[in-house]
Regions:
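A short, hydrophobic beta-strand/beta-hairpin element that forms part of a small beta-sheet core
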Residues: 78-87
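Thiol-based oxidoreductase modules, predominantly thioredoxin-like and allied folds used
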Residues: 56-66
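Non-catalytic, surface beta->alpha helical segment in thiol-disulfide oxidoreductase systems
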Residues: 87-122
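Local sequence-structure signature of Cys/Sec-based thiol-disulfide redox active-site neighborhoods
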Residues: 26-48
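Thiol/disulfide oxidoreductase modules built on the thioredoxin-like
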Residues: 72-76
């Protein structure tokens, strides 16, 4: 299990152990608002998807206003950013607090699957 560090009241950091020294650090940020029922499970799925990958930092950013949402790369809650870029190419930015849906093999869901997240992390890792 990783260590939780509080940097700001709205930002939690969980570091997963590095297993392979040759891979670079990756930062995954989960952008959410409190009314979203899926943001905590998103963190659990990202953690599961990152298992076995080196030096992955998982952070959470709580969005509280439409203005904040408009100023961020936010495509609805939960938005999962890898090194500041949406993990999925089909992201459509929104300017208000809204829930997001993801296309999965079983249809539209409020979260991507662990497999989809693992593929997104590995794609991003291979680009570095």
């Amino acid at each position: 299990a990783g260590e939780i560090v509080r940097r700001r009241p709205y930002l939690k950091v969980k570091r997963l152990p590095a297993l392979y020294a040759h891979n670079r650090h990756m930062r995954v940020e989960i952008v959410y608002f409190d009314g979203c029922p899926n943001w905590q499970e998103a963190g659990a799925r990202v953690g599961a998807a990152a298992a076995g990958l080196a030096d992955v930092e998982i952070t959470y950013r709580r969005v509280t206003t439409d203005e904040e949402a408009a100023a961020l790369p936010f495509a609805g809650s939960p938005t999962i950013l890898i090194d500041g870029t949406d993990a999925f190419d089909d992201a459509v930015p929104v300017t208000e607090l809204a829930c997001r849906v993801y296309q999965t093999d079983t249809g539209l869901m409020g979260l991507p699957t662990v497999t989809q997240l693992n593929e997104a992390l590995r794609r991003r890792q291979s680009r570095s």
